[in-house]
Amino acid sequence: MLNKDLVDHDLSDEVCELLPASRHKTYVVKVGQVKIGGNNPIVVQSMALGVHIDSDNVKSSAKRYAKEIIELAHAGSELVRIALNSEEVARAVPYIVEEINKEGFDGKILVGCGQYELDKLVRNYPDNIKMLGKIRINPGNIGFGDKHDEKFERVIEYAITHDIPVRIGVNWGSLDKYLLQKLMDENSLSNNPKSSDVILRKALVMSALNSAQKAEEIGLSLDKIVISCKVSRVQDLISVYTALAKSSNYALHLGLTEAGTGNKGMISTTAGLTYLLQNGIGDTIRASLTQRPGEPRVNEVAVCQEILQSIGLRHFNPQVNSCPGCGRTNSDRFRILTEEVNDYIKIRMPTWKKKNPGVEHMNIAVMGCIVNGPGESKHANLGISLPGYGEKPISAVYKDGKYFKTLQGDNIFEEFKAIIDDYVKEHYT
């Protein structure tokens, strides 16, 4: 039953205001030409799968490594992380940067992800590592016991000397075991002990914040610090980042540490990141997808872009809205046309981006029958309503909410493509 009093009270203009919430205020961190945090656009990041670096032919290996990084950059990745896991990779960095620069990108898009060997590499290859735009430190394995603080301090001092931003990246798969054990012991003695999951989340947040504070004490400025706490479960991700946002103003990198493959990976990533972004939390994101053999690594970039575009935080390509089809839709023509329009946009976008700024905000509707076709088309910049069962074999086209013309015959796509081209030329110059 409808609660009229509640409806009258709640259905105010404020209730219908658009999300997201106001952005969580964070310090701005500049990585090359990319700005993370503050009111800057959410940054899309990826990680290269990498190649084996042949110690006897580092330059040739570096070129193959750079090829993947360049593919990710062309797909829209604004930062690309590489595993800084060997002396060979450290030696390859200048050659990788050279290839990236040749392609017209800034070599500073590279983020070096160091683990156990990071302290050694920054000492042995200081001139190479400083060519990176940012380095990532994992507090859980940069060193253990008495060596932890010593190695952490050396890396931070190196970053300060060379003016390199640092991401302090905590991961629940490699969490500082001493900190975790300490919190577990304290919890076991408590009169009101919490679950182990709560203590694990607390340890993640404390590890990140304690490490960031330690970096500040050493001398790393606030505009050089990004933090992250990676987990694999969506609810843990939301809990941990909500706590980080309440506790600090460091720039935040979002993502599940291992999202998984296929639909599961994409849905988990979307669920977690969307909630946080809608609540104003997050400055840079990555979709850590397990690609099936043969799948392009650039898929993770596309997922991040789709998340940001779907919730209105950024625009990368014209949006194509299309109906799913039902018993009213006639044949596969609207599905085929949808695919053709999407493919055409992909082909044209490199040119449009250069010549037609703003085209990424364009909205196109491809609908399959008269029920929602005209109405949905009127909400788009361009819309086409194909005929369903029992309808005349014609397709109505709408421009900026008004009827424009009717198409029919076997060349609907070619004619609609021409309409798209004309619209882009007329409105985005």
Curated annotation (Swiss-Prot):
Cofactors (names): [4Fe-4S] cluster
Enzyme class: oxidoreductase
Keywords: 4Fe-4S, Iron, Iron-sulfur, Isoprene biosynthesis, Metal-binding, Oxidoreductase
E.C. number(s) listed in UniProt: 1.17.7.3
Molecular functions (GO terms): 4 iron, 4 sulfur cluster binding; 4-hydroxy-3-methylbut-2-en-1-yl diphosphate synthase activity (ferredoxin); 4-hydroxy-3-methylbut-2-enyl-diphosphate synthase activity (flavodoxin); iron ion binding
An annotated GO BP: isopentenyl diphosphate biosynthetic process, methylerythritol 4-phosphate pathway
Pathway(s) it belongs to: Isoprenoid biosynthesis; isopentenyl diphosphate biosynthesis via DXP pathway; isopentenyl diphosphate from 1-deoxy-D-xylulose 5-phosphate: step 5/6
Binding site for [4Fe-4S] cluster: C323, C326, C369, E376
Disulfide bonds: none
Domain of life from the UniProt record: Bacteria
Cross-referenced InterPro entries: Dihydropteroate_synth-like_sf, IspG_bac, IspG_bac-typ, NO2/SO3_Rdtase_4Fe4S_sf
Reactions mediated catalytically: (2E)-4-hydroxy-3-methylbut-2-enyl diphosphate + oxidized [flavodoxin] + H2O + 2 H(+) = 2-C-methyl-D-erythritol 2,4-cyclic diphosphate + reduced [flavodoxin]
Co-factor note (free text): Binds 1 [4Fe-4S] cluster.
Family listed: Belongs to the IspG family.
Protein purpose: Converts 2C-methyl-D-erythritol 2,4-cyclodiphosphate (ME-2,4cPP) into 1-hydroxy-2-methyl-2-(E)-butenyl 4-diphosphate.
NCBIfam families xrefs: ispG_gcpE, PRK00366.1
Name of this protein: 4-hydroxy-3-methylbut-2-en-1-yl diphosphate synthase (flavodoxin)
Species of provenance: Wolbachia sp. subsp. Brugia malayi (strain TRS)
Taxonomic lineage from the root: Bacteria, Pseudomonadati, Pseudomonadota, Alphaproteobacteria, Rickettsiales
